[in-house]
Curated annotation (Swiss-Prot):
Disulfide bonds: none annotated. This is HECT-type ubiquitin ligase-interacting protein creD. The gene is creD. It comes from Emericella nidulans (strain FGSC A4 / ATCC 38163 / CBS 112.46 / NRRL 194 / M139). Belongs to the arrestin family. One of its GO terms (biological process) is regulation of protein ubiquitination.
Length: 597
């Protein structure tokens, strides 16, 4: 405020311009008094002097004042009495020029600017204006002191706004009241958020489902109620509180639904009424304050609803409900010195709502219960999973099946466990035309086989077979097949953990009591280490073994052979066999060998 607000007569003609300019129109605190950060207030005092003047000082004062006052109704005891209390809770003074006690100085003509700044604590009370005799205000007062003339004074108000943080739960939590009036009505009344920006509107969603045939819906009344709790001595908890409480109605909305045209199916379950009402808030603080609790002034708001129910027998029932709401001032909607919105157009209001909805980062209240990524099991999100096969599990994984030949089961530990694939591999393996291994080599390792006595012992009689009978064998690994394949292409088709693989191989009882399964994770020694050392391994475990049933040194005997796995990978052993017999004959002999196992 410039020259028109000077106190003084002709002396003002020497000061053509005198004003307080703020870098920001108002100070914004985000959060409550216990959590809000400090704010920086800055500006400058501008003075334009056309002629030299004599001055004592140039000062600027910032003062915070709180006042609580109420009038008791004349009809009550002590009617007409006025209770009030005013206090100065903040003071700050800047001295730009000071000639000293009882002294003056000449200020030459010219333009002057005096900058000022101060840090305001986040716990300072917010501005509360709009009531006639109750308020919390901040005011600047700039003065040019003169000795033989009236002082030149200019004043300017300062508004401090306390708004909600972007993470406040009031901005993200919907408020609703839902219940069932037995044999009467099921209802739900809700608002999108608890917090509402001053000067905007409140949307209320109704859902009414009659439970009584013939029940009608009458008038629906929605009210916004403002409550004031005033206390004279809030800073003195030990003193007897002198308080006064009053309420006023801010909005009163009455609505009647058209039952014939408004009836609809709700949630695909029942017939009812579903609609929304918009309650426009006043655009001035004199008719509606923001929610606050500071310096003995407490303001709260709530929505009250009354729904008339027209019973079939003619009497009228009334449904009542209440929802709390919180009204706060947005920095995006400017308020002038008369406590009115500067721009109350719908476009400005919508812009404030959009700015609130598009705050970044996202609202914490919407994600505080989210599961941490490290705790999420990816098996349900990544398809197929690491243990998933291309189709239905093969029969060999079923516990209803059993296998007598444990060595043949070991062959499928790291490869495709298809029974048909295993059968095809065994059929193509020609075991004829190779010299038999003597029993002395069996005794060298001294490890018992699947279905017979220890090496070196002979059993005559029922288990005799011709010298040309096929032998059961397995390939300990697919190294000979994948020698020329780059690393990674020979990865097992269906990877399983050691526990699952061990559990999935179920031998018959007779096989299980005679032998043990080689551990899945046992280390395989190389060929040179096995042939270079004489290893005597204790029965029944053999980390590296393959069992072959074949003809012994004499007719009518069973010989059992155990040897290192790399033995079977020798080219002379695998490729020096003849192929004179047909595939059908090999299949028959293979089946006979399986039966004897």
């Amino acid at each position: 405020m410039a020259l028109s607000f000077f106190s003084g007569g002709g002396s003002a003609s020497h000061a053509k311009y005198f004003d307080i300019r703020l870098d920001e129109d108002y100070i914004v605190f985000r959060g409550g008094e216990q959590e809000a950060a400090s704010a920086h207030l800055s500006g400058k005092l501008v003075l334009c002097v056309s002629e030299p003047i004599s001055i004592k000082h140039i000062r600027l004062h910032l003062t915070g004042i709180s006042r609580v006052c109420w009038h008791l109704p004349s009809s009550s005891a002590g009617g007409g009495r006025k209770n009030w209390r005013e206090r100065v809770f903040y003071e700050k003074t800047w001295k730009f020029r000071d000639a000293g006690k009882s002294k003056t100085e000449i200020l030459p003509a010219g333009n002057y600017e005096y900058p000022f700044d101060v840090i305001l604590e986040g716990s300072m009370p917010e501005s509360v204006e709009g009531l006639s005799d109750t308020y919390v205000t901040y005011r600047f007062k700039a003065e040019i002191g003169r000795k033989y003339a009236k002082d030149i004074v200019v004043r300017r108000p300062l508004r401090i706004i306390r708004t909600l943080e972007s993470s406040a739960l009031e901005l993200s939590h919907a408020m609703s009241v839902e219940n069932i009036w037995p044999n009467k009505i099921e209802y739900s009344i809700s608002t999108p958020t608890k917090a509402v920006i001053f000067g905007t509107s409140i949307r209320v969603d109704f859902k009414l489902i009659p439970l009584l045939k013939g029940l009608g819906i009458g008038q629906i009344i929605s009210q916004l109620i403002e409550t004031h709790d005033l206390t004279l001595n809030p800073e003195d908890p030990d003193a007897i509180r002198n308080t006064y409480k009053t309420t006023r109605t801010i909005i009163n909305d009455e609505h009647t639904i058209d039952e014939e045209n408004s009836l609809e199916i709700i949630d695909e379950a029942a017939e009812g009424f579903q609609f929304s009402r918009t309650l426009d808030l006043p655009k001035t603080l004199t008719r509606c304050l923001q929610d606050t609790d500071t310096r003995g002034i407490k303001v709260r708001h709530k929505l009250k609803f009354r729904v008339q129910l027209l019973n079939p027998d003619g009497h009228i029932s009334e449904l009542r409900a209440t929802l709390p709401v919180s009204i706060f001032i947005s920095p995006n909607l400017a308020i002038d010195d008369n406590n009115n919105l500067v721009d109350s157009s719908p476009q400005t209001t919508q812009r404030a709502l959009d700015d609130l909805a598009q705050q970044a980062p996202p609202l914490y209240g919407e994600h505080q219960f989210d599961q941490l990524y490290s705790e999420v099991d990816p098996s349900g999100y990544r398809t197929p999973g690491p243990g998933s096969g291309p189709g239905t599990p093969f029969g060999t994984l079923s516990r209803n099946l059993s296998a007598e030949n444990l060595a043949s089961m070991n062959a499928i530990t790291h490869t495709d466990i298809s029974a048909s694939a295993l059968h095809h591999r065994l059929v193509n393996l020609d075991l004829r035309g190779h010299g038999r291994v003597s029993a002395s080599e069996h005794d060298h390792l001294g490890v018992p086989s699947d279905n017979g006595p220890p090496s070196g012992s002979n059993t005559h009689g029922s288990n005799t077979h011709a010298p040309g009978s096929p032998e059961l064998s397995r390939r300990a690994s697919d190294e000979d097949v994948h020698d020329n394949i780059p690393s990674g292409m020979a990865t097992p088709f269906i990877p399983h953990s050691a526990e699952l693989e061990t559990l999935s191989r179920v031998p018959s009882y007779s096989t299980a009591v005679r032998s043990s399964v080689r551990p899945h994770d046992s280390d395989l020694p190389d060929y040179q280490a096995v042939v270079a050392e004489t290893v005597h391994m204790s029965a029944p475990q053999s980390p590296q073994q393959a069992h072959i049933r074949g003809s012994g040194t004499g007719r009518g005997s069973d010989s059992y052979f155990s040897a290192p796995m790399d033995f079977f990978h020798r080219p002379a052993f695998l490729h020096s066999r003849s192929h004179s017999h047909s595939d059908d004959e090999r299949r028959i002999r293979l089946t006979q060998a399986r039966g004897r196992a």
